[in-house]
């Protein structure tokens, strides 16, 4: 049996990544047009979570997780790759629709004076805050996509009979979700809503396979 060529793998599956063009245009259009969100997302739990600038590093590691999981599943397990794209892109699309219908934002970001510290992590945080307005936050796309990546990878052929890899995927995704609230990029409500968008796919895509993968 011949090993599938790069061209044969590119043709049926990689075109899913064209969605990113649509997503980025749509996302930044919303970011530029929604300046005064109608709904402010807040929970009393948010007030109990301290700001910690060092969580900006797991927050930014989302890009590494996205690239790594997408590439590995595309190359080694196209069935899981297709499921990842279905879960993640449909969820991201729903999030953008919600932002349009229910424009929402946050008011929990601390000022530089309130932080009272000057270090690399704070500097990175301030750069992100300048570029990323505190609007379009619920559900959290950061958390929704992280959950999809952990789920798809942990149920893939790559993680089958490799509990350590499953643990790494879930711990990494968990740290990313935690980072969103410790950096005040999101409310805990955003996180919960984002993860709900992941959970709804489990019975449809993994109801039977979960037993096999374990």
Regions found by a protein language model. Name each.
Residues 1-66, 116-118:
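N-terminal transmembrane-helix/juxtamembrane module of multi-pass inner/ER membrane proteins
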Residues 21, 58-65, 141-145, 192-196:
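Membrane-embedded alpha-helical segments of multi-pass membrane proteins
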Residues 24-29, 92-101, 171-181:
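Aromatic-anchored segments of alpha-helical transmembrane domains
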Residues 31-44, 74-164, 212:
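Membrane-interface loops
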Residues 56-72, 89, 93, 145:
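Hydrophobic alpha-helical transmembrane segments
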Residues 65-70, 146-152, 171-179:
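Hydrophobic, membrane-inserted alpha-helices
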Residues 113, 133-138, 175-202:
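Interfacial helix-loop-helix junctions of multi-pass membrane proteins
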Residues 204-214:
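Membrane-interface capping segments at transmembrane-helix boundaries
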């Amino acid at each position: 049996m011949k090993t599938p060529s790069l061209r044969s793998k590119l043709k049926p599956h990689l075109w899913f990544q064209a969605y990113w063009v649509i997503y980025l245009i749509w996302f930044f259009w919303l970011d530029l047009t929604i300046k005064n969100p109608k709904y402010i997302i807040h929970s009393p739990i948010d007030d109990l979570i301290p700001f910690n600038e060092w969580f900006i590093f797991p927050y930014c590691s989302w890009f590494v997780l996205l690239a790594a999981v997408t590439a590995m599943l595309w190359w080694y397990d196209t069935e899981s790759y297709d499921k990842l794209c279905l879960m993640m892109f449909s969820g991201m699309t729903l999030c953008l629709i919600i932002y349009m219908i229910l424009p929402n934002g946050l008011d929990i970001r601390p000022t530089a004076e309130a932080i009272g510290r000057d270090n690399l992590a704070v500097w990175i945080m301030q750069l992100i805050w300048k570029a990323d307005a505190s609007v379009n936050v619920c559900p959290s796309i950061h958390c929704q996509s992280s959950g999809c990546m952990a789920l798809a990878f942990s149920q893939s052929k790559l993680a089958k009979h490799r509990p350590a890899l499953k643990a790494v995927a879930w711990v990494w995704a968990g740290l990313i979700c935690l980072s969103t609230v410790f950096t005040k990029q999101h409310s805990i409500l955003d996180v919960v809503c984002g993860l709900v968008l992941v959970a709804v796919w489990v019975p449809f895509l993994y109801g039977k396979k979960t037993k096999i993968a374990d």
